[in-house]
Amino acid sequence: MMRIALFLLTNLAVMVVFGLVLSLTGIQSSSVQGLMIMALLFGFGGSFVSLLMSKWMALRSVGGEVIEQPRNERERWLVNTVATQARQAGIAMPQVAIYHAPDINAFATGARRDASLVAVSTGLLQNMSPDEAEAVIAHEISHIANGDMVTMTLIQGVVNTFVIFISRILAQLAAGFMGGNRDEGEESNGNPLIYFAVATVLELVFGILASIITMWFSRHREFHADAGSAKLVGREKMIAALQRLKTSYEPQEATSMMAFCINGKSKSLSELFMTHPPLDKRIEALRTGEYLK
């Protein structure tokens, strides 16, 4: 499924651009209520822009090609498998794409359950058995059926709102303290350059810290997507697919795409910032049936 750093980077870029426009035009709300309204509009705005552009951004990021008409047996099998599983999951047929990468990976994205995309790497088609590939596709179909992208958009919107709100409150305080010469009765945010610089830095820092929340959600939904795959094609097929991933190449997708793929990077500074749970934990969760209840 399509998810996180590309999503986060787009959100961050939108917030920084909005902040720059507001600062240059002098549109600074001195009231807490006004600032909160602005934060809500821009916070959720960035999330929904990312959601609406998600298919285009994902395909562009990996150089994916949508299959309009299957050209060979492999593409025909892929399209038929996606169609069968989409019917089983009760969703409309997603677009199907292939992208060139040596690693075993796949992702799904889209603004709605009935307007989605499933993409798989050439490495997956070449190195996985049909049963394993079927399980990976079912994992991505489950992400779509669970509505993970919409849920993530709402979570990211709330996170964005608080990042904007808190950073600008602190920026106003810093600007007023460091350069705020103002006449009596005059409303001011202090030095506008200090305000913009502090607000931008704080938005970047708080945005990174807030990503812990979205990373947690990303890991949590991976367990549920694994369980969804097990229900669609069988638990053993999904376990076999995860075991195959343990021996696969290090993913070659851009770092910004890791949260959108089934096979996220396993090496990270901390599990707090990992988009995916360790593969061993995912396999154990399937064996115990923890998320199948």
UniProtKB/Swiss-Prot annotation:
One cellular-component annotation, GO: plasma membrane
Membrane topology: Multi-pass membrane protein
Record topological domains on the Cytoplasmic side: 1-3, 55-157, 214-293
Topological region Periplasmic: 25-33, 179-192
Broad EC category: hydrolase
Molecular function terms, GO-annotated: metalloendopeptidase activity; zinc ion binding
Active site per the UniProt annotation: 140
Cofactor(s) annotated in UniProt: Zn(2+)
EC number annotated for this UniProt entry: 3.4.24.-
InterPro entries registered for this protein in UniProt: HtpX_protease (IPR050083), Pept_M48_protease_HtpX (IPR022919), Peptidase_M48 (IPR001915)
Subcellular compartments: Cell inner membrane
CDD domains tied to this protein: M48B_HtpX_like (cd07335)
A biological process from GO: proteolysis
Keyword Acetylation: no
Name of the protein: Protease HtpX
